[in-house]
Each structure stands twice: as C-alpha cells, then as structure tokens.
C-alpha cells in the first residue's frame, strides 16, 4: 500500500529492551514503535482503568470502551509525548503457581507472585494477601524454576510462549484483568512522516486490530490445551 515507502522489521522477546527502556527509546527515536501493555499505567493514571479487576467483560465490551474512551487515552498518551497508533490485545490474565490452586482470593495468601510494574496490580494482589513483586517478563521463567517466585499471572499466549507450564503445577482460570496492548509511537517522531505514509500506517493498525481479536479468540482454546497437556 505504501509503494515501498514502508518497511517494518519486528523484534520479539525483549530484544530491543524491556518495557521501560522501550518507552524511553521511543522518545529518543531509537525505535519507531513499541507494543506496551500494563506498563502504560505508569505513564498515566488513565491507563490504570485496565488494571482494575473484572472491568472488561469480553472483547466486544473492550471495543465499546475503546470507541467511547479512545480520545481520552490518546490525550493522556500525547500529554506524555506518545501517540497511540492502534490497539492490539495482551488478553485476559490468569494465575499459575506452585503452591496451591487459586479458587478464592484468600488462596493467594503468602504466594510470591510475579507481576508487571503496575502500581494498581500490586495494590490488588496485596489486598488479596499475595506477595506481589514486579519483574521483567524475560526473567520470569528462571524465577519460577528456581523458586524465587511461586507464581505469575498472564494471558494464555504469554504463558504458553514462555513455557511457564513447564515449571508450574497449577493454572487457575481467573480472568481477573483484561489488558490491551498499545501500538505506541513517539508523537514527535510519528508526526514527521508524510501524510500518505501516516494514512497507510493508521489504516493498517485499524484493520489489523480486527484480525488480532479474531486470532486471539481462536487461540484461547488451543493454547489452554497446550498448557493442560503439560500436566498443569
């Protein structure tokens, strides 16, 4: 669509840095786009709404929230020097651990639980009695394997891709938080691109969101089977 003007190179698994580093690299122009999720609540409190338990019911609900509050989130991002190009999803988060099944909040009592760096998530799990500790995603597998952490909470996609099922005994399907992922750019650097390039980028972001939602919904059953197959 861009007649060769746009070439996208993707880097996964924190190759270009952890969440906080990538936010800084965006502003410095060292990367063009990042895909942050929970860390956005540390950028502006408006994004903390997605850290509240059981706020988002399903993807259709998320679409309505985005339609109604999208301008609010964009303004919050731009006030900090960022621009939201589009929305993907991180997904509904579930708890895995090696201590016990989590059926009620009190089952979290004393569990050393890895969380993203989100003050709201930390508050939530502290109220539930857990011992939440922020930690970079790339460090979680080793922390679970060595017992530094008892458990963690993530969507199925992250659990399966990081192979947490290999070092965890229990999966509790809690769906306690739904976290979007934001296609994020530096406002200053994004605005420097020609109008025709921006039109293509924005169009692709919008059309890809629909694909991401469809794919995520389809993968939920498939990835849950992968996790269960490991004996969790």
Locations of regions flagged by a protein language model:
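N-terminal secretory/targeting leader peptides
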Residues: 1-61, 69-73, 77-232
């Amino acid at each position: 669509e861009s007649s060769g003007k746009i070439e996208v190179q993707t880097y996964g698994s924190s190759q270009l840095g952890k969440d906080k580093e990538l936010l800084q690299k965006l502003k410095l122009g060292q990367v063009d786009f990042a895909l942050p999720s929970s860390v956005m609540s540390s950028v502006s409190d408006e994004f903390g709404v997605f850290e509240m338990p059981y706020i988002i019911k399903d993807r259709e609900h998320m679409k309505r929230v985005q339609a109604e509050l999208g301008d609010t989130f964009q303004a919050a991002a731009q006030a900090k020097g960022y621009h939201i190009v589009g929305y993907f999803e991180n997904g509904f988060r579930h708890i895995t651990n090696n201590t016990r099944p989590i059926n009620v909040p009190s089952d979290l009592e004393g569990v050393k639980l890895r969380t993203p760096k989100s003050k709201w998530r930390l508050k939530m799990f502290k109220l539930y009695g857990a011992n939440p500790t922020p930690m970079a995603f790339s460090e979680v597998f080793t922390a679970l394997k060595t017992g530094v952490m008892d458990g963690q909470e993530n969507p199925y996609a992250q659990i399966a891709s990081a192979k947490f099922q290999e070092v965890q005994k229990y999966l509790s399907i809690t769906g306690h938080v739904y976290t979007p992922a934001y296609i994020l750019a530096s406002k200053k650097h994004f605005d420097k691109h020609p109008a025709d390039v921006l039109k293509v980028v924005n169009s692709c972001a919008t059309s890809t969101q629909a694909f991401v939602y469809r794919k995520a919904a389809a993968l939920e059953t498939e990835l849950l089977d992968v996790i269960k197959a490991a004996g969790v």
